[in-house]
UniProtKB/Swiss-Prot annotation:
Locations listed in the record: Mitochondrion inner membrane
Protein name: NADH dehydrogenase [ubiquinone] 1 beta subcomplex subunit 6
Bilayer topology annotation: Single-pass membrane protein
Coiled-coil zones: none
Length: 128
């Protein structure tokens, strides 16, 4: 026995018809695609109105604005964050912030200068 049975032939014919119909459905009509209206932010709306007449000086201002925003967000802010982290969180003594100064009492000697802290003055007329 060779060849397809009548049921198999019918099934293949139906599959071919389905494929043809599916391919035909994939073709777009002249009205398609229907795109939703594009949302424009207030800042973008301002720049669109500002640049409408095409004056050269307005274009220069816009390019300066765009480059400064890029520099601020991609250079300056990361540098500030790195500086803050290095200054306040990476502590390799003795070249960082002094977290707690040592207490000094009357009669103590300051090591760097050799100065002796004098005793506190007495104020007999004031009460604590």
């Amino acid at each position: 026995m060779s060849g397809y049975t009548p049921e198999e032939k019918l099934r293949l014919q139906q599959l071919r018809e389905l494929r043809r119909r599916w391919l035909k459905d994939q073709e777009l009509s002249p009205r398609e695609p229907v795109l939703p209206p594009q949302r424009v932010s207030p800042v973008e709306r301002f720049w669109n109105k500002f640049l409408q007449d095409g004056a050269l000086w307005k274009n220069v201002i816009y390019k300066t604005y765009r480059h400064s925003i890029f520099a601020f967000t991609h250079v300056l802010i990361p540098v500030w964050i790195i500086h803050y982290y290095l200054k306040y969180h990476v502590t390799t003594k003795p070249y960082t912030i002094v977290e707690k100064k040592p207490r000094i009492f009357p009669g103590d000697t300051i090591l760097e200068t050799g100065e002796v802290i004098p005793p506190m003055k007495e104020f007999p007329d004031q009460h604590h």
